[in-house]
Amino acid sequence: MNKVIIYTKDICGYCDRAKNFFKSKNINYTEYNINKEPKKFNEMIKISNGMKTLPQIFINKMHIGGYDDLKSIINTGKFDKIIK
């Protein structure tokens, strides 16, 4: 079973788009909202090689990046291979 983790924040259009994409595919995900869980921000920076923008998306412990990165792997057909 795949595991998707999305680091988000309040009032973030790209975060909402990423979550809506996974919902539309019936893919469960764990969301860490840094406004509600500030300690998760430092964790995210550490495991994403210093990225501070949101969202940050991980699939099966693989760092995907932000929403534009997610769109890129979808458009190139890599998403289906990664999510399996």
Residue ranges with predicted function:
Residues 29-41:
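Thiol-based oxidoreductase modules, predominantly thioredoxin-like and allied folds used
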Residues 13, 36-39, 52, 65:
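Short alpha-helical
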Residues 49-58, 68:
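Structural micro-motif
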